Regions:
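Flexible glycine/acidic-rich beta-alpha junction loops that bind and position SAM and/or redox cofactors
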Residues: 58-61, 78-108, 123
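Eukaryotic endosomal/vacuolar membrane-trafficking regulators centered on PX-domain-mediated PI3P pathways
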Residues: 34, 106-114
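Radical SAM enzyme core and accessory elements
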Residues: 113-179
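Radical SAM/AdoMet-radical enzyme domain recognition
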Residues: 1-83
Length: 179
């Protein structure tokens, strides 16, 4: 049999150090060149469809608009598939502070103005998700679980989230809740 079409999905969770933290021990400086190779290959071989797949969670919520813009500029022929993460609870976006949720929504709206309509139309569900998340605000129990999760993962990995995603402002060393 002859294969007429191949679809490849590249699952990433952010751009740069955000992806490195979530996908630890992944290293962006090796991921990006590989994505560029696939992008070139897909452009040269019309029987290959490539897409970027991403789940929005508390750890990449603030970075997603930036990542979206960079993905679109770096890989214009790639399709995008983005969905909000609902489980596990400790990674839900309502573990972020209200100001972080509002900042993420502001950033997303700014980025959507820069993208072509055929891209933004695919992101209507994500825009609604960001708006609803900002409207609902912080869940203190989820925030506590997020801080505990990151503290545990930092301890196990021997790293510190502040070196990867400093704007989350999660003080995992003393587990204080900053809401």
């Amino acid at each position: 049999q002859r294969v007429n079409r191949v679809s490849i999905g590249h699952s990433i969770e952010g751009w740069g150090t955000v992806n490195d933290y979530i996908r630890y021990p992944a290293q962006w400086n090796s991921i990006l060149p590989n994505l560029k190779k696939f992008h070139t290959y897909a452009q040269e071989n019309k029987s290959v469809d490539s897409s970027l797949i991403m789940c929005i969670m508390s750890l990449n919520y603030l970075d997603f608009p930036n990542a979206l813009l960079k993905m679109h500029k770096e890989f214009p022929s790639f399709d995008f598939h983005v969905e909000p993460l609902h489980q596990p609870r400790q990674l839900r976006v309502n573990g972020l502070t209200r100001s972080q949720l509002e900042l993420g929504l502001f950033r997303l709206n700014m980025v959507l103005r820069e993208l072509r309509e055929h891209i933004t139309s695919k992101l209507e569900n994500i825009k609604r998700f960001y708006q609803q998340s900002a409207d609902q605000g912080t869940n203190q129990e989820t925030r506590t679980k997020l801080i505990e999760y990151c503290s545990h993962m930092d301890h196990v990995r021997g790293i510190n989230i502040q070196n990867y995603i400093p704007e989350l402002q999660l003080n995992t060393q003393d587990r204080k809740i900053n809401a």
